[in-house]
Structures are given as structure tokens and as C-alpha cells.
Amino acid sequence: MRVGVLGAKGKVGATMVRAVAAADDLTLSAELDAGDPLSLLTDGNTEVVIDFTHPDVVMGNLEFLIDNGIHAVVGTTGFTAERFQQVESWLVAKPNTSVLIAPNFAIGAVLSMHFAKQAARFFDSAEVIELHHPHKAEAPSGTAARTAKLIAEARKGLPPNPDATSTSLPGARGADVDGIPVHAVRLAGLVAHQEVLFGTEGEILTIRHDSLDRTSFVPGVLLAVRRIAERPGLTVGLEPLLDLH
């Protein structure tokens, strides 16, 4: 399988270049960064592209890839409901093309989101804290936002988080994602970390995941690359490939 990497000079992208080059069953067909023409992908007969670029350019990348029938595995963040709808509209004309967009490719992070969804309905309170390096473009992270949405979905019909706060400084209680407070930390020395806190009378459950190195994303990305053709259309999250429902 011929695989191209977009964002090849970034920290995650460079990790993916090395991973693809080291895989016996994959061929690195192109490695592109800012300013490189996307036509290099078609020139290299690329079948699947790994995109770890920037929210400002990822939609243009996807439009090109879909138009050319190239499958896409996307770790770039910043996707909204409107962006997902746009991707789906492009895919209508290319029913055999696959796009997988995931907020996190670390297997442990995907499992932690799944565990949080399972635990959510058993506790009165839930909050999310995400911690990342200071170069991250958005806050909260895509993983934290998705985690909060999964928790809110699992708690549908239950009372809201108890919170007697009547006055606070702006942002002190975090961002509100579907009723779940999400707090973002940006600190030198961090890579990617998340804590999900659940509380009820007499006990607290903490689900924590730490990516200590960007190689933690490699197994999930390569799994998606190898299996993406099995899922035409848009897939959001790595969960379907791990049989997590």
C-alpha cells in the first residue's frame, strides 16, 4: 500500500514518516509539508494519506484527496459538525473513498474515552481536564471535547452536574461542552494528557491517560491506514476499528 504523509516535518508527521518507512507492508510514496504541491501525492500513486497538518489547511487537503479518490486518515483537529457535513457532501460523488477522522490515535486514549462513557451514568458529577504542550493550536483538545460529548450523551436524562457557583472569574469553571466542564492546561514539557473526574457521595473515580511520546499514536494510525478501505465514507473516531461500541 502506497502511503503519503501531510505535515511531514511536524513532530507527529515526522513520527508517521518513520513509522510508514519502517513498515514492511507499506511504501512511503510522498512526504509533504507547508508549501509543497498536493499533486505530488497523485504523482506518487498514493493510495492513503495520513494528515497531521493544521485546522486552517486540512479542509483543502481533504477536498483534494476526495476528488482524487485517495483515502485519508486524519489526526488534525479543529473539526466541527459543519466540517463533518462538508466532508460527507464531498464524499457523495466518491462512494468508494474513505475518510477516517479521529481526535486521538493513541489506543489508551481511545479506551479511556470508552471507559468514561461507560462510567458516566453512575456518578453525580463529571469534569474533564486536558493538558498539552503550549504549541497546540486549539483548546480544549479534540479528545477532551469528544470525551465530554460522550459523557453528556451517556448522562442524557440525568440531572446536571451539581454546582453552586454563583460568581467566578471568566473561564474559572472551564468551557461548557454539552453541560460538562472541560479545563485546558498548556505547559512546557507536556505532550498529551487527560483526566476524566467522576464524583458521587463518598467516592471519586479518575480515568487518566498520558501520551509520553508521539510514538503512542503510531499503532492506531497504522491500524487505520491498513483498514480504512473497509469503511467507505466518513468514519469519526478509531472506536469502530477496535470493536468498541
Swiss-Prot record:
Coiled coil: none annotated. Its main location: cytoplasm. GO terms for molecular function: 4-hydroxy-tetrahydrodipicolinate reductase; NAD binding; NADP binding; oxidoreductase activity, acting on CH or CH2 groups, NAD or NADP as acceptor. The active site is at residues 132, 136. The keyword Transport does not apply. It comes from the Bacteria. Pathway: Amino-acid biosynthesis; L-lysine biosynthesis via DAP pathway; (S)-tetrahydrodipicolinate from L-aspartate: step 4/4. Signal peptide: none annotated. PANTHER family: 4-HYDROXY-TETRAHYDRODIPICOLINATE REDUCTASE 1, CHLOROPLASTIC-RELATED (PTHR20836:SF0), DIHYDRODIPICOLINATE REDUCTASE (PTHR20836). Belongs to the DapB family. This is 4-hydroxy-tetrahydrodipicolinate reductase. It comes from Mycobacterium bovis (strain ATCC BAA-935 / AF2122/97). The gene is dapB.
